[in-house]
């Protein structure tokens, strides 16, 4: 049954419930409350919602979780509806509105991300804005942050973590919109991690050179990517599995190099995952290092050579299959991969019974 009120057709409660159930909503009563809240009043947002919600509800119903999608739509308006022009943009861009509905009803991660940076919605109207940035472009941005925040770890950490959030969101929106493939999205996310970790290591090395009062670094330090990170399969919320290795410079003894490397790693971890900023952490997971959680966070090249030759277990050798250079001293990484990792992961002899 329908009644007319101010020239608008209003469904009875029973009919509205049936309508929402037929679309795919699991909780039609909650959906009705959301729609009532979104369309109440004479404000600009309410007027636009009254225009676009019929189509929006249908598009949300095509997703895996229409209820989550409508809740996310309401959260966007509560957070930004009176301050942003995003609703007007969606009214004028059918393709962007449809893409947004697909994202909100299928991805909790991206729904939460959009509620932190509503300006990203505008990307949905232009495929060029959804293209993953090249490594070169990422390096330009991190280089600028290094120059700007070279003496402030909190500001640098905030810039790096915000960049990760921003770029992973871009790639996620692109993937959900069908602009880039699964494999390209994973590679693009890995590039973001590589660029940020490399810049963070550079910041830490520069800071500790100043702290130690030396002109050059007493040690070269490299980040070897492992696990899914090493396999370039980073997703929205992946940790960065890694091994950290140092090698003393020609004019430095191992004691000084070790002390320097430890302080650099301390800075690196603070930038990526310390309590220096409210931006989400970038977890640098070092559990795959020699001796696992019992081993030092950063190990010398010579120590790695001895450990892998004499003590490495079968699973540690297998873990090296995905090892690759990620950041820092490229020559040190190359030596580790060629001289230590390759003979273990690509053996020329037959496996033993234990292996």
Where are these regions (language model features)?
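Conserved phosphate-interacting/catalytic interface
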Residues: 1
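A nucleotide- and high-energy phosphate-metabolite-utilizing enzyme signature
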Residues: 4-355
């Amino acid at each position: 049954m329908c009644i007319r009120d101010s020239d608008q057709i209003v469904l009875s409660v029973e009919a509205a419930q049936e309508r929402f159930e037929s679309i795919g909503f699991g909780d039609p009563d909650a959906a009705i409350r959301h729609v009532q809240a979104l369309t109440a009043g004479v404000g600009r947002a309410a007027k636009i919602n009254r225009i676009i919600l019929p189509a929006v509800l249908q598009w949300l119903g095509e997703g895996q979780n229409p209820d989550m999608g409508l809740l996310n739509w309401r959260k966007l308006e509560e957070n930004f509806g009176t301050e942003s022009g995003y609703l007007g943009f969606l009214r004028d861009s059918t393709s962007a509105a449809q893409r947004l509905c697909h994202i909100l009803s299928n991805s909790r991660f991206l729904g939460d991300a959009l509620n932190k940076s509503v300006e990203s919605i505008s990307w949905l109207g232009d495929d060029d804005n959804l293209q993953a940035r090249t490594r070169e472009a990422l390096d330009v941005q991190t280089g600028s942050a290094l120059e700007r925040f070279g003496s402030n770890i909190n500001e640098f950490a905030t810039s790096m973590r915000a960049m990760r959030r921003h770029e992973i969101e871009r790639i996620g929106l692109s993937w959900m919109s069908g602009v880039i493939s699964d494999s390209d999205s994973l590679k693009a996310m890995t590039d973001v991690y590589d660029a940020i970790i490399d810049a963070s290591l550079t910041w830490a090395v520069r800071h500790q050179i100043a702290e130690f009062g030396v002109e050059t670094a007493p040690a070269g330090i490299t980040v070897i990517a492992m696990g899914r990170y090493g396999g370039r399969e980073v997703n929205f919320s992946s940790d960065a599995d890694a091994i950290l290795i140092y090698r003393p410079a020609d004019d430095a003894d191992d004691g000084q190099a070790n002390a320097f490397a430890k302080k650099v790693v301390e800075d690196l971890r603070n930038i990526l995952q310390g309590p220096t900023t409210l931006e989400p952490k970038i977890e640098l997971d070092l559990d795959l290092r020699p001796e696992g959680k019992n081993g030092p966070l950063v190990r010398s090249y010579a120590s790695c050579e001895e450990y892998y030759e004499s003590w490495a277990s079968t699973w540690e050798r297998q873990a090296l299959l995905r090892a690759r250079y990620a950041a820092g001293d490229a020559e040190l990484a190359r030596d580790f991969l060629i001289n230590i990792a390759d003979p273990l992961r690509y053996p020329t002899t037959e496996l033993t019974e234990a292996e």
